[in-house]
Amino acid sequence: MIVTKKQTCYTDLISRILTLDIAPGSMLDEKLLSDEYELSRTPLREVFQKLAGEGYLNLQENRGAKVSSMDLPNMRNFFQSAPMIYAAIARLAAENANERQITALKMAQKRFRMASENSETREMAMHNHEFHRIMGDMAGNPYLSPSLNRLLIDHTRMSQMFYKPVNSKERLLVWEACDQHDQMIEAIEKADPATIVELTMEHWELSRGRIEKFVRPDPLDMDLGMQEAGE
């Protein structure tokens, strides 16, 4: 299958947005991207329109394309909605998954575990995104899928913090999350919706605290500030 420049631009921009290579709220430079991907204005704008429809960008009249922000109202909506959406998707996935989808989920988990073993933050975040996107495919609900996909955009961006552990305790959390994926796959194979909903909520709570630190970091050391002021 031949991959066009337009397809390359589309998939690459998704990756760059999800991994924070392009920061939330950034305006995209149409001329720069046109040169980088060797696309004329019309196909590039078609890529922007597709990404906007999926929640990655906001198109502003006479101002161009802006990466979806992660401001306070958005984050509030994220933390309110995530548990409900993840639980509903998980239940439907356990009820509706087919063998082909389960195989795809196992492959995504294999890639996620390999990235975890190699401490590859970017790859862990992207493979986790893939894992939960496949669960959305399993659910097969046209009303929930757009909500899940939009949720995953912000979750993946914030998970850069979770997948960059700074001590042994945080590294153990990453491994626990990896093991929970295996347990979720097992529950799906057994068509056990009650178990997977419980696992999904545990999975959410495991990462929630670390994700919150992304938008609410620890305050600066007051003693250090006072010391610098006195010098």
Language-model features and meaning:
Residues 70-76, 90-97, 115-120, 164-173:
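A ubiquitous short alpha-helical element
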Residues 85, 108-111, 115, 127-134, ...:
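Amphipathic coiled-coil alpha-helices
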Residues 14, 18, 90, 94, ...:
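Regular secondary-structure segments
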Residues 81-97, 130-170:
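Hydrophobic, amphipathic alpha-helical faces that serve as interaction scaffolds
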Residues 118, 160-231:
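C-terminal all-alpha effector/ligand-binding and dimerization domain
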Residues 78, 105, 124, 128, ...:
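Hydrophobic packing residues in well-ordered alpha-helices of helical domains and bundles
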Residues 84, 110-114, 153, 157, ...:
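Residue-level marker of structural boundaries
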Residues 1-95, 100-101, 143, 212-231:
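Short linear motifs at protein or domain termini
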